[in-house]
A protein has these predicted regions:
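Recognition helix of helix-turn-helix/homeodomain-like DNA-binding domains
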Residues: 39-65
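Residues within the alpha-helical elements of helix-turn-helix
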Residues: 27, 38, 67
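DNA-binding alpha-helical recognition surfaces that contact promoter or target DNA
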Residues: 23, 48, 77
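Key DNA-contact positions within bacterial/archaeal DNA-binding proteins
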Residues: 33, 44, 73
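A short, Lys/Arg-rich alpha-helix, primarily the initiator
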Residues: 2-30
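Short amphipathic recognition helices of helix-turn-helix/homeodomain-type DNA-binding modules
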Residues: 66-88
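Residues within the helices of the helix-turn-helix
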Residues: 22, 33, 62
Length: 88
């Protein structure tokens, strides 16, 4: 067993990407309305993302990367892992 595999975090639960999105914008001092403005997405869409009613698409992930500085791959992986966990 390698040190990496010994200490790798593998939770048995999934956190909705919207929770992480809200935590991220909170930490940056950005409101949902400001995020909507900066991404060019309707506020309704941002609210749906945060509330887990809408999925983070590849396009949305790129917009979040541009505005928040968090790589699109992070958002894409978070969304994929969450959806996979919900189906298990």
């Amino acid at each position: 067993m390698t040190a990496k595999s010994r200490f790798e975090f593998k939770p048995d639960y999934a956190i909705a990407p919207g929770v992480t999105l809200q935590e991220t914008i909170d930490s940056l001092g950005i409101s949902q309305a400001e995020l909507a403005k900066r991404t060019g997405r309707p506020l309704k869409t941002i609210r749906e993302l945060v509330n887990g009613k809408a999925a983070i698409t590849a396009e949305t992930a790129l917009q979040l990367e541009r505005v928040l500085g968090v790589p699109a791959s992070f958002w894409n992986n978070l969304e994929r892992n969450y959806r996979e966990a919900r189906w298990r």
